[in-house]
Amino acid sequence: MDEPTILLTNDDGIESAGLRAVYDGLSTVGDVTAVAPAEDQSAVGRAISHEVTVHEHELGYAVEGTPSDCVVAGLEALVTDTDLVVAGCNRGANLGAYVLGRSGTVSAAVEATFFDVPAMAVSMYIPVREDAAFADIEANGDSYREAAKATTYLADHAVDAGVFEQCDYLNINAPVAEWGDAQMTVTRPSHLYEMDAEQDGDAVTLHDRIWEHMADGDIPDPEGTDRRAVVDGKVSVSPLTAPHTTEHHEALDAIAETYEPDDGGEAAD
């Protein structure tokens, strides 16, 4: 492929240090246009709007909308010759199967796959306990060095190598650069899930206990999972598919065959 046209988005907002770090890296291997939210849109999943306002920006376009809005607007109106969509770099990791539908960063990559455009989501792990104030954790442009390096390398090599003939998108998670040089390893999303909730009067507080285990380096995730790789100081790359499909389901077929729409939906004897 000649120099690719790359659409860059994120969910932290177009002014974020992570997006700028990845923009600078990708600009060495492609023609990059940022189409990113004007404000922070973290954890909005694939929320979509009917209409968005777009402002010109030195890096491309600032969109008053969600990451998925940015991808749709970008691919269909603003950067219609896009060869690759990159989302990130997110300030904070997106690890495990359970975050894939929550993350605005990952959701932007998923949105791109429905346009048959290869995509990558990239995030940076910041060690912090859940009871700490995540917003107070500093992450400047230099902290994203490993994430930007890995993203640039994959953007330069993955398409021509046929990677996206076997998957729809890549979910990349890198450690902070302060941990030193990081090897790259191919992973699968961890299935560990430790959400819980505590009620105090009218308030219910939700906790994700996994972050505490990660900060302590005490996780049960086996080798080969994304979370294990990042805690061990490696760049995790998970090749994923977007459409939710299933195998033929005989048990459900049997139930569906007994459904009679004229009897209130009760199954026949």
Curated annotation (Swiss-Prot):
Its EC number is 3.1.3.5. Its cofactor is a divalent metal cation. Binds 1 divalent metal cation per subunit. Keywords: Cytoplasm, Hydrolase, Metal-binding, Nucleotide-binding. It holds the Pfam family SurE. Coiled coil: none annotated. SUPFAM superfamilies: SurE-like. Belongs to the SurE nucleotidase family. Nucleotidase that shows phosphatase activity on nucleoside 5'-monophosphates. This is 5'-nucleotidase SurE. It comes from Haloarcula marismortui (strain ATCC 43049 / DSM 3752 / JCM 8966 / VKM B-1809). The lineage of its organism: Archaea, Methanobacteriati, Methanobacteriota, Stenosarchaea group, Halobacteria.
